[in-house]
Amino acid sequence: MFYGGWKEIEIQRGLEQISGQFSLQVTDRWAGQADSRPIRPGQACVLTIDREPVLTGWVDETQPGYDANSTWFNVSGRDRTGDLIDCSAIFKSGQWKGASLKRIAMDLVSPYKIAVVVGPLAEKRAHAAIASFNIEDGESVFDCLERGARMQGVMIWTDGRGQLVIDMPGTKKAATALVQGENILRLDGKFSWQERFSEYIVKGQARGKPHGKGSAVDAVVSRYRPLIILAEDQAHGPSAARRAEWERTVRIGRGNRATVRVQSWRQAGDSGPLWAPGLRVMLDSPRLRISAEMLIVSVTYLKNAQDGTVCDLEIADPRAFDLLSGVRSAGLKSSRNGDKGLDSGRKEKKHRKKKGEEDFSEL
């Protein structure tokens, strides 16, 4: 059944969230609809934009209400994978020996009738055998899968069709650049060291063997800020080092962000494809002192009386994610000589990186 009567819409999708989510405000009835409020919690739903699915899942809540001047009916829900966030991880004995991340994921999500898709950049890691993996008591399915993804250095998200995706961001480019003074309605930047550390030290314990240990350095963090992480598995040297690199990489990517608002859910005005997570997009913003290719991490489609039809794009330095996938990007450039953009070109002598290694944003 198709539903109409939409008044306000917010749909969010992202590479760093296992489930998309939506919030809608609708009228009690609309043309051709005789029943009042036919949408109910627990119903299956597919949200499409011009027949293109952007979310496939379930209605979580309905919130009817009224006051002296108006009535309203709010509906919210998530992708099918939202159940993986809420529900406990259960599978036979709760232990796997020599299973791949894909096998573990399939075993955990099969009761929810969710398909597991492995992208091309994660093929090797998603199919590599994990010596031993256990469900921890009280752990949700998402927590269990996210722990496995950290161990293998990959990411998990959903694709708008209700499937669980194991992959890394690719290199597909957006058809439209983001240019200050042209199509950028608003831009909010965030450059933070709060969750970044100078060194990440991962420790593991293999039975009958000494502690496995690995480390990774964030060359931009110039003061002493160490972080010790206990490995999720019985880590040995190489896996502990990979886990440390994963932690550093993800924290760098999350520490440097900007949210760009554009007019329309589609690129090139209303004529191009939908804005989508995972696209590479050129950003030219003298105000932020950036002229570079960025990665769209999440997309929020909005429609309301105040803002009209707009799209919020959360973007990040793609090199942080490239370290995970093995892809190399060009360095970010400051749009003004002598100014400090995302990549200032300045390196602390104390943490000078070796030739061939990347430096990251500094503000």
Question: Each predicted region: which residue ranges?
Answer:
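Short solvent-exposed strand/turn elements
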Residues: 70-89, 307-327
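Assembly/oligomerization scaffold segments
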Residues: 1-90, 151-153, 174, 179-187
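Flexible glycine-/small-residue-rich
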Residues: 26, 77-79, 168, 204, ...
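Acidic, small/polar-enriched beta strand-loop surface segments
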Residues: 146, 150, 155-306, 319-363
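Beta-strand secondary-structure signal
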Residues: 21-25, 44-46, 74-76, 201, ...
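Charged- and aromatic-enriched interaction segments used to assemble
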Residues: 69-192, 358-363
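Envelope-exposed proteins and targeting segments
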Residues: 20, 43, 53-55, 71-73, ...
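Short, acidic/charged, Gly/Pro-enriched secondary-structure junctions
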Residues: 29-64, 95-111, 270-293, 297
